[in-house]
């Protein structure tokens, strides 16, 4: 009798987990968001900290890691040296890490120069928050990292 009760509880938990997973998939529309999100990302052009315009699609075709960050975001600042190390380790494998700042150019340039950051740092300003939402972060919270594969 105990074995039957345990099986019923296990089956109920499995169904609950399946239902929760299906609800999350429908709520966040993960599969439908992939292609339009990548298209939206690669359609962007931002200036870098030196004022040069940089289209995101210049990195299309490789593995692209885009981290949305700001100089006023403590976790963002904390992860920047780690991202730079990852870039150095995986650059020969076609991986590029790009920082897109929800910030202003002077703050980003000062941070880059003081911290000796060699990653491409682009300036989206407040408009970048809408892009973050399109890429699957409805709250616009930072830091937010997006990984785009080769295809």
Give residue ranges: language-model regions.
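N-terminal targeting signals for export/organelle localization
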Residues: 1-47
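Thiol/disulfide oxidoreductase modules built on the thioredoxin-like
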Residues: 8, 111-119, 124-151
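Conserved hydrophobic/aromatic "anchor" residues
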Residues: 44, 68-69, 111, 119
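Short active-site neighborhood of thiol/selenol oxidoreductases, capturing the structured segment around
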Residues: 54-74, 83
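Active-site acidic short loop of glycosyltransferases
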Residues: 59-62, 92, 118, 140
